[in-house]
């Protein structure tokens, strides 16, 4: 990854680590999402392929995080001359400086705990609904909407949906999906009860939960 200089780790999840980085040639600040390819896997993991394809399809929306590039890297092993290099995939995203969870916590955990101002809640919910509507109009369920997956540009007041690793293209009539999805607190009742046939309502339920979270002290 000679093109980028890692500055700090900003997140870590089930599907990889996320770094704040600088593109050396331009000085642009970006986010790098690292996904390791296990040696017994044939090619790129399905979650990474799915996220790449969905982001490319949805990238024209202001309210979806932009995928800038995809980099494949063979990382040499440490202190093992006969070990094959470890293949890695880096997804290069536009960088946003915080997420909704951290932003809410700045209000909730201060010396004077309080919910977000109504004007901010209204703005964020409007942008979230626009992003979700864009996903659904292109036949995509996000399935993991939560404050940690909503990135914020604090200077511009813009909210963007991120982390489509659990996203799915949906069809009519509906087909079966796994019910082992999304963080428990934002999970729709039909998913909690084990249904494998569901549609856009699972994302709308999560939007309602996020709205409640914004107003909770």
Stretches found by the model and what they are:
Residues 177-191:
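Conserved activation segment of eukaryotic-like protein kinases, specifically the C-terminal portion
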Residues 49-50, 86-90, 94-156, 205:
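Conserved alphaE helix
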Residues 166-168:
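Activation segment
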Residues 29, 34-60, 75-77:
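Conserved N-lobe beta3->alphaC-helix segment of eukaryotic protein kinase catalytic domains
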């Amino acid at each position: 990854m000679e093109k980028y200089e890692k500055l700090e780790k900003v997140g870590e999840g089930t599907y990889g680590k996320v770094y704040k980085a600088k593109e050396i040639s331009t000085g642009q600040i970006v986010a790098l999402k690292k996904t390791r390819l296990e040696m017994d896997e044939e090619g790129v993991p399905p979650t990474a392929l799915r996220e790449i394809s969905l982001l490319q399809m949805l990238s024209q929306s202001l309210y979806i995080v932009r995928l800038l590039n995809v980099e494949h890297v063979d990382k040499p092993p440490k202190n093992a001359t006969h070990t094959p290099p470890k293949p890695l995939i880096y997804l290069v995203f536009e960088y946003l400086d915080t997420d909704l969870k951290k932003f809410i916590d700045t209000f909730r955990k201060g010396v004077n705990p309080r919910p977000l101002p109504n004007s901010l809640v209204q703005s964020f919910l409007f942008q979230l609904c626009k992003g979700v509507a864009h996903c659904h109009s292109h036949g995509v369920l996000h399935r993991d909407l939560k404050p940690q997956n909503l990135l914020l540009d604090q200077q511009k007041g813009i909210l963007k949906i991120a982390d489509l690793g659990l996203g799915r293209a949906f069809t009519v009539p509906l087909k079966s999906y796994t019910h082992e999805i999304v963080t428990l607190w934002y999970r729709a009742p039909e998913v909690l009860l084990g249904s494998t046939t569901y549609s856009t309502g699972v994302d709308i339920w999560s939007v309602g939960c996020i709205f409640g979270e914004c107003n909770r002290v």
